[in-house]
Swiss-Prot record:
InterPro entries: Ribosomal_bL33, Ribosomal_bL33_CS, Ribosomal_bL33_sf, Ribosomal_zn-bd. The keyword Ribosomal protein applies. One of its GO terms (biological process) is translation. It comes from the Bacteria. This is Large ribosomal subunit protein bL33B. GO terms for molecular function: structural constituent of ribosome. The keyword Ribonucleoprotein applies. PANTHER family: 50S RIBOSOMAL PROTEIN L33, CHLOROPLASTIC, LARGE RIBOSOMAL SUBUNIT PROTEIN BL33C. It comes from Mycoplasmopsis agalactiae (strain NCTC 10123 / CIP 59.7 / PG2).
Length: 50
């Protein structure tokens, strides 16, 4: 099964900071990770955006 690409955006400033891949069969729900945002200069929640 091919892996699909997606971007992660900061929930505070809405800036798209990270690009990642996932297997939709194993993880069908949207990804939410706490990552560093350079614009906010802090670790914030990042959500999946297609």
């Amino acid at each position: 099964m091919p892996r699909d690409g997606f971007t992660l955006f900061c929930t505070d400033c809405k800036m798209e900071n990270y690009i990642s891949k996932k297997n939709k069969k194993n993880t069908p729900e949207k990804v939410e990770l706490k990552k560093f945002c350079a614009k906010c200069n802090a670790s914030t929640l990042h959500k999946e955006k297609k």
